[in-house]
Amino acid sequence: SGFGKCSLTVALPILSAAGIETSALPTAILSTHTGGISGYTYRDLTEDMRPVMKHWKSLDIKFDAIYTGFLGSFEQFFDAFRQEDNLILVDPVMGDNGELYTVFTREFAAGMRMLCQKADIIVPNLTEAALLLDEPYHPGPYTHAYIESLLRKLGALGPQKVVLTGVYFKEDE
C-alpha cells in the first residue's frame, strides 16, 4: 500500500530491526490500505513477478524464510523457492471485520486455503479464519472453546503453527 501503516511499510523496518535480511517481491500495488478508505486503486503484479522470480532462480538465490501478506494471485512462488529447511509463513490477507476485501472473491479464499496447506505458520485474523474454513464470521466476544476449535480446524489445513489475531474474550473468562 502506498499510504497507510500496513504491508511492507510496516513489515520491512521490523524485520530489519530484528537483523533479518529481506528481499521484497511486491505482489500488488494499492494506493492506500483497504481498511476503511474507499476509492483505493489496485494493480495485481503477478505478470511482473515472473521475470523477477526467473532472474532470482538463475542466480540460485536461496531463502531462509518466505513471508507473504497481500497477494494478487497464487503464483507458485513457494514451489519455485521452497527448500527442505526454509520456513513458510502466510498471512492470508483477505478481509477484516467479517468482510472479504472488495478486490477478492470467494474463489480467492479457496485458493488461499490451498496456499495455507503449504505453509509452516499461518497468521489469519478472525475474518480470514472464517473464510479459510468456509464458516460464518462470528464478531465476538469469543469463548476459549470457540477459539480453540478454530485453531484446531485451521491446524488441520496443514500448517505446523497457527497464530490467530484479533481475539478478545468475554469479560468473565
Language-model-detected regions and their locations in the chain:
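Conserved N-terminal subdomain of the carbohydrate kinase-like
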Residues: 2-102
